[in-house]
Amino acid sequence: MVKTVNGEPLRHRPLQFNDIERVTEVSLLAFSDSATWKWRFKGMSSETMKALTMQLTRDAYFDPHVTCIVAYTDSNPYVGFLAFKKFPPDPNVSYRDWILKSLNKYYSNFLYWWYGAQIVQKRFHYNELQYGAALYKTGLLKNPKGFIHIHFVCVDPALQGNGVGGYLLDMAHDLADEYQIPCFLMASKMAFKMYEHLGYKTSVIANLVDEDTGELIRESPGMIREPKQPSSHET
């Protein structure tokens, strides 16, 4: 059955470089009320916030191990966005991909310097450490078959509630079911119920605390979806 949004078929395609700015705009709208995002960019201008969020999208685009998907309709080329990675990643990376990822890393460091946003870079690094510790506690890193890490999913706020998030996530879920491996993500408050509906269960809680002030920013649930078992006629 074809998924529709406002009567139009919902489709998807790989993220292209020229999509990065528009996808970033959707991301900023989708997470405008996120306490985590407000903390990450606290004290920064809207211009800086957009520039650095665009760089996050570039980071995903230039990572050869990350799958980036854009959902769209005939009238709206940017309905939603998904980025995920299969772990452990394929160790075979082309020289071209390695060079592009390395150059992007240098450019990322330049941007933080250019915008005087080293504190934002520090917060992101600290955030990654907290989420990484949460992932370690799940035991998934020791899973011999691996797992799929959902890095990012967002939907245009005007179109949320139409099943777009589930549509995007099903692409990762289908791959997980094929390999019979779990999916892991850190849930946003706004999408928590959707993740539960899709079969995710809370496995761990990461307490995101401001390293400088000691303020508790958010208790972030780390959630796991176990793969669906193949039906008898598929085995």
UniProtKB/Swiss-Prot annotation:
Record-linked Gene3D superfamilies: 3.40.630.30
The EC number(s) this enzyme carries: 2.3.1.-
SUPFAM superfamilies, alphabetized: Acyl-CoA N-acyltransferases (Nat) (SSF55729)
Which residues are in the N-acetyltransferase domain?
82-221
Q: Which CDD domains match?
A: NAT_SF
Q: How does it sit in the membrane?
A: Peripheral membrane protein
**Pfam families in the record, alphabetically?**
Acetyltransf_10
Q: What class of enzyme is it?
A: transferase
Is Metal-binding included in the keywords of this UniProt record?
Answer: no
- Give the subcellular location: Golgi apparatus membrane; Endoplasmic reticulum membrane
UniProt keywords (A-Z) are: Acyltransferase, Endoplasmic reticulum, Golgi apparatus, Membrane, Transferase
GO MF terms listed in the record are: acyltransferase activity, transferring groups other than amino-acyl groups
Query: What are its GO cellular component terms?
Result: endoplasmic reticulum; endoplasmic reticulum membrane; Golgi apparatus; Golgi membrane
Family assignment from sequence similarity: Belongs to the acetyltransferase family.
Q: Would you tell me the protein name for this molecule?
A: Uncharacterized N-acetyltransferase C56E4.07
What is the organism field in this record?
Schizosaccharomyces pombe (strain 972 / ATCC 24843)
